[in-house]
């Protein structure tokens, strides 16, 4: 039976699976104090719950995250790092690219189509959106309204109008009144 050895090594593997360069960024993503990692490393603690979460969110192999047995992912051809935007209070910030397995995304026309997909992190939601969405149809979109960057549900109305829902207030406007950046193709929520 393999032994779970905790501490610094397992934390480093978790950081690598998520694609973070330092513990502070990982802690921010996980919503925990970064000093926790220092305590775990010093005491040789094995963070089993975090290992399971990492495997679930990144698609990394359990054998790698828990024990360090390469490779990190089953099929590296299916792993892609996506440009990532963090939304906070209507403002957007570009953060480190984050990995995700392509089989978990909806099928697109071609593998090249995934180059137009980007990731959006907002509170406890993660969205994947594509800038190649063709004609506007009802659905969730990443939009800019009056310099606020938002995820909103758009309904197409007659006469070139749209209805924007999802905030405190819904409103109708011309499509040209807002900027549509991308259509959401996958939405995930952290429980």
UniProtKB/Swiss-Prot annotation:
InterPro entries: Lambda_DNA-bd_dom_sf, Phage_CI_C, Phage_CI_N
Statement: the UniProt record of this protein carries the keyword Transcription: yes
Keyword DNA repair: no
Keywords, comma-separated and alphabetical: DNA-binding, Repressor, Transcription, Transcription regulation
GO MF annotations in UniProt: DNA binding
Transmembrane residue ranges: none
GO biological process: negative regulation of DNA-templated transcription; protein complex oligomerization
Free-text function comment from the UniProt entry: Repressor of lysogeny.
Name of this protein: Repressor protein CI
């Amino acid at each position: 039976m393999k032994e779970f050895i905790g501490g610094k090594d397992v934390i480093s593997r978790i950081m690598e699976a998520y694609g973070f360069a330092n513990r502070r960024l990982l802690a921010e993503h996980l919503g925990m104090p970064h000093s926790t990692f220092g305590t775990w490393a010093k005491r040789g603690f094995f963070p089993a719950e975090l290992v399971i979460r990492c495997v679930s969110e990144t698609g990394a192999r359990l054998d790698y995250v828990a024990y360090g047995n390469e490779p990190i992912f089953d099929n590296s051809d299916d792993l892609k790092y996506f440009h990532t935007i963090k939304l906070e209070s209507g403002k957007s910030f570009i953060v480190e690219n984050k990995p995700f397995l392509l089989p978990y995304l909806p099928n697109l026309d071609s593998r090249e189509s995934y180059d137009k997909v980007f990731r959006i992190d907002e509170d406890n939601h993660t969205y994947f959106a594509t800038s190649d969405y063709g004609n506007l149809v009802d659905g969730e979109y990443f939009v800019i309204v009056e310099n606020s960057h938002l995820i909103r549900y758009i309904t197409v109305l007659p006469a070139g109008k749209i209805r924007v829902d999802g905030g405190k207030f819904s409103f109708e406007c011309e499509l040209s009144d807002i900027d549509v950046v991308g259509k959401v193709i996958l939405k995930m929520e952290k429980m």
